[in-house]
């Protein structure tokens, strides 16, 4: 129950304070709500192996869905607002958390947290996109050497390699 309550509270920042520019990035508000809820809940339950729970909750479904012929990328273009409901599903709720968690591990927890703060401060009461967040993290991570945009492109692709290639969300 705590996770659900905190998920909805996280939408006050990710979804309300900063709203996606368009529904292409609807996944960001959902993944951040889950991501932040987990960050807050975990310390209250130190006896739980949260990494194992995450793995069991997301990896199997993400692999299965992403490997199908009709798999969609996380970041999907939306031409008709009437079809916005079609964007929600296992790709957003199972694969997107893997991408976000890997991104945090790629840049480090402190840089990721500070980047999120800058993102919320910069775009408060406005709109932002996935590339906006990546630009902030990339600038902070390696003085703009361009490493994160290549990783972030995974959100726009389906059928990610499952061979353990560096930089894939399935590592």
Residue map of PLM features:
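Hydrophobic alpha-helical and helix-loop surface patches within well-folded domains
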Residues: 1-171
């Amino acid at each position: 129950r705590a996770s659900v309550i905190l998920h909805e509270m996280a939408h006050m920042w990710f979804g309300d304070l900063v709203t996606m520019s368009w529904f292409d990035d609807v996944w960001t508000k959902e993944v951040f709500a889950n991501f932040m809820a987990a960050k807050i809940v975990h310390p209250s339950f130190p006896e739980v192996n949260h990494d194992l729970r995450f793995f069991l909750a997301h990896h199997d479904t993400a692999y299965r869905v992403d490997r199908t012929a009709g798999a969609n990328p996380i970041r999907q273009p939306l031409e008709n607002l009437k079809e916005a409901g079609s964007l929600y599903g296992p790709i957003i709720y199972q694969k997107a958390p893997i991408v976000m968690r890997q991104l945090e591990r790629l840049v480090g927890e402190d840089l990721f947290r500070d980047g999120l703060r800058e993102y919320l401060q910069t775009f408060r009461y406005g709109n932002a996109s996935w590339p906006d967040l990546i630009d902030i993290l990339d600038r902070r991570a390696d003085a703009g050497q361009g490493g994160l945009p290549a990783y972030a492109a995974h959100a726009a692709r389906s059928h990610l390699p499952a061979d353990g290639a560096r930089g894939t969300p399935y590592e």
